Amino acid sequence: MTKKIHINAFEMNCVGHIAHGLWRHPENQRHRYTDLNYWTELAQLLEKGKFDALFLADVVGIYDVYRQSRDTAVREAVQIPVNDPLMLISAMAYVTKHLAFAVTFSTTYEHPYGHARRMSTLDHLTKGRIAWNVVTSHLPSADKNFGIKKILEHDERYDLADEYLEVCYKLWEGSWEDNAVIRDIENNIYTDPSKVHEINHSGKYFEVPGPHLCEPSPQRTPVIYQAGMSERGREFAAKHAECVFLGGKDVETLKFFVDDIRKRAKKYGRNPDHIKMFAGICVIVGKTHDEAMEKLNSFQKYWSLEGHLAHYGGGTGYDLSKYSSNDYIGSISVGEIINNMSKLDGKWFKLSVGTPKKVADEMQYLVEEAGIDGFNLVQYVSPGTFVDFIELVVPELQKRGLYRVDYEEGTYREKLFGKGNYRLPDDHIAARYRNISSNV
């Protein structure tokens, strides 16, 4: 195996992201999430560890399915309170040079015209280190609070997202020509008006004449992430995504998703290798196996079953408080689900516990056997999870030639796909909008 493994830190601008209850752990600093220094320190730590990116999750609603109430989520800080992730990026970019930032933003609630400007602005300010994790959202409470009168079904949300990205692509890729900005001081011409174009988009969901408000940024289009593993989500990923955050924690599940999405990508004329696949991973590492187990046991003491049941309810729509332990949801009994939720076992992602060698072995195995390209690293305590990984696992991966020793120059897209590849490839669907002046 010669390819380098890509590593992102999986974070959220809140107290309780995934490991619910652990905000109480004495080594956890997640209560500092409202302190900008917390985020700049974290960004510098991740860059020290040669991480590819900080992947920022987000929700714009409350988990209120469990017990038909928001109280459990609010009481236990299950992704609430939660602040806007976009506001963090400029400060973190200022104190780093190479670390990229993948930010989650929903296509369901806000207009693409304004969003396109925000992403272009961040791409300028980060010098091409921005990515967008495209989500369609799923929480009914978000629909209510954004005043959505006609609730879109799951697949129609992806129809809207398709058009949303089409609008953004037109603005980013085609509205301004590469040489539109000339900065001619003598003739008082900053931008050549003939090289700035309307997009004249008219669709089912959006009417956007254009032009884009921003001059071309280093990447133009941010690196596109996607994380939905439904049938429709995988189709969307095959069409749009450059990076996919996969569900699953075993080789069989991950390999199925990898092969399926890459096969679908060929239908759109895309090179399947132009899509990087990321799996979630939870790592508890120690210099010895016993030390790692001590950490796991320490985390388990603060693990909250109620918090995870609230999260499960919001994510699946099932209120387990209504069921007996002998009832079944699909092929799994409710008792089994609750038992699984009570244990710190990775839940949705692979859990790796042990020495640096054991963790590196398991990561390498998943990359080689499932065909993935990297991982989103979940944290249990902040910044301890990342510190341990950087100090113990990174040197082991570097020793095997599986992880960068230093960064290469360039944008985030170039760091993923090679020097010179700062724009979307020609086989991406967005490329058709580059000569928009001759297409509209």
Curated annotation (Swiss-Prot):
SUPFAM superfamilies attached to this UniProt entry: Bacterial luciferase-like
Molecular function, one GO term: nucleotide binding
Keywords recorded for this protein, A-Z: Flavoprotein, FMN, Monooxygenase, Nucleotide-binding, Oxidoreductase, Plasmid, Secreted
Binding-site residues, FMN: 58, 137-138, 158, 227-230
InterPro entries named in the record: Diverse_substr_monoxygenases (IPR051260), Luciferase-like_dom (IPR011251), Luciferase-like_sf (IPR036661), NTA_MOA (IPR016215)
Temperature dependence: Optimum temperature is 60 degrees Celsius.
EC number(s) given by UniProt: 1.14.14.28
Variant or mutagenesis effect after changing residue 146 to C: Loss of activity with hexadecane as substrate. 2.9-fold increase in activity toward hexadecane
GO cellular component: extracellular region
Function, in words: Involved in the degradation of long-chain alkanes. Converts alkanes ranging from C(15) to C(36) into their corresponding primary alcohols.
Family designation: Belongs to the NtaA/SnaA/DszA monooxygenase family.
PANTHER family linked: ALKANESULFONATE MONOOXYGENASE-RELATED, C2H2 FINGER DOMAIN TRANSCRIPTION FACTOR (EUROFUNG)-RELATED
Protein's name according to its UniProt entry: Long-chain alkane monooxygenase
Organism of derivation: Geobacillus thermodenitrificans (strain NG80-2)
